């Protein structure tokens, strides 16, 4: 660690996570008198304009959102030529870690998590923000039980250029196992519908402990998204209600026009599916046949 105090305000106490893009430190804010997370971008602003631009995008994106299920940002700055973000220190476990510990999650758990994730994602979309990297690793269950979305490093506000997965150039924005087909083809920009595709895959992972399309070879995963039939959730986990499987299928349609067009549509169907699961006698047979006819 190159510093112990940032801007004579934030006292660094621990390195709590690092990757190619950034390092996250636990710190104490001497003005607010509370623990915070400091995300220090691994670049020199004078030498890496691309990384600095990504940082500015993340800071602008996160500052635009105020929601219980989205991590809060308190400020940003530059110290020793390194940009940093000051955020809530989120105590808890990632959804990915929770899935690993349990192999798969139960219907009640999946429903509870999904409703909170949808709430946070709706706040993003209402601000014209697309997350672009929805996945279990970027969803944290706090010690108080609330779920929050984190890591807006690849998000954007409003109109941006189309983003491609390029096989020979290996250009990837997001995580390949959760990228919507239209992003892989490059024929549409990221949208609420591509976030919904990733959310459907996240839901699949919650129920099975696996991604539907996965391989150590990224071009193979891309081709699966584009051409392979979506695998059955119930084949891996027969306890999943068919109504929930149908919802996942609709989230993950290859044609974005056949998916839920916004997260509120998804929320409504989840509420109906959960009511059917908890009170099956109250629901008419065949009620969900309309899911793919909307």
Model regions and ranges:
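Conserved short submotifs of the Hanks-type protein kinase catalytic core
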Residues: 80-94, 98
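Activation-segment/catalytic-loop signature of the eukaryotic protein kinase fold
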Residues: 76
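Protein kinase catalytic-loop region centered on the HRD/HxD motif
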Residues: 119-129
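Activation segment signature within eukaryotic-like protein kinase domains
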Residues: 113-114
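AlphaC helix of the eukaryotic protein kinase fold
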Residues: 42-64
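Protein kinase glycine-rich loop
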Residues: 13-19, 24
